[in-house]
Regions:
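Charge-biased low-complexity segments
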Residues: 23-242
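Bacterial Sec-dependent N-terminal signal peptides
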Residues: 1-26, 242
Length: 242
């Protein structure tokens, strides 16, 4: 009888352990970007488990990585919209292992509150996730302001100003909407950092003479006729000067 009971318990345990179903998921992040990943369905939530990919226009790989128990593990690879490798980030050690040189012109620019002399050394802040995919969470938080004339959607430029603390944390976001060619703000509003996950608020801080400092990241975006925005596509002619 004891052997029979033990066998029943073992079978029930195996049934519960192997009853977790792995499901392939696909989500649309923006008009142009979709993500595909595997999840384990638990009682209260979906847990990402396994290979993760994101694609631009359904065919160009933007991201390749792996989740274990909803946590990014190992080295993730991030690409631009042309499929060029932009960044390798080691999530096991929270370390940047590769960052491609930034071309010029670039839709991203950076500021620190220091006058940089010839002998000074400054480095810009870096977003884990690369210079395209890493910034999509902020673009997804964009909302069209009430009263904005739809006739001007595709004539508008949207600029995000991200304030990054010396600790490498997102401190504030200011959104500027202007008409193309004017450089004059038509609307300005803030997006609270509280809207984002802890991972989406992490940066490698800017440095000035090897000391971490506060900085600003400016992201230039274009708006289409539907009111959707994307980081402006600029063809870089050469790496920016260091």
């Amino acid at each position: 009888m004891k052997k029979l009971l033990l066998s029943i318990v073992t079978v029930l345990c195996l049934g519960d352990c192997f009853g977790q179903k792995i499901v392939d998921r696909k989500n649309k992040l923006t008009n142009n970007v979709t993500e595909r990943f595997e999840t384990v369905i638990e009682a209260t939530k979906q847990v990402k488990q396994g290979i993760y990919h994101a694609f631009f226009d359904k065919k160009i790989v933007l991201v390749s990585g792996k989740y274990v128990n909803d946590k990014k593990v190992g080295t993730w690879h991030y690409f631009d919209r042309d499929g060029t490798l932009m960044q390798n980030y080691d999530y096991d050690n929270n370390k940047l292992s590769y960052e491609a040189p930034e071309g010029f012109p670039s839709p991203l620019s950076y500021d620190i509150d220091y006058f940089i002399k010839d002998n000074d050394k400054a480095t810009p802040p870096v977003r884990p996730g690369g210079r395209y995919f890493g910034y999509l969470p902020y673009l997804r938080a964009f909302k069209l302001p009430p009263g904005m004339d739809a006739d001007y959607y595709d004539r508008s430029i949207v600029t995000f100003d991200l304030l990054i603390s010396p600790m490498g944390r997102l401190a504030d976001i200011v959104v500027h909407i202007s008409r193309k060619g004017t450089g004059v703000d038509q609307m300005v509003y803030n997006i609270s950092p509280d809207l984002f996950s802890a991972d989406d608020k992490i940066f490698i801080p800017a440095t000035f003479n090897k000391n971490p400092v506060a900085s600003q990241i400016h992201i230039l975006c274009a708006m289409d006729a539907t009111g959707a925005i994307d980081i402006m596509y600029l063809i870089a002619r050469e790496p920016a000067e260091k």
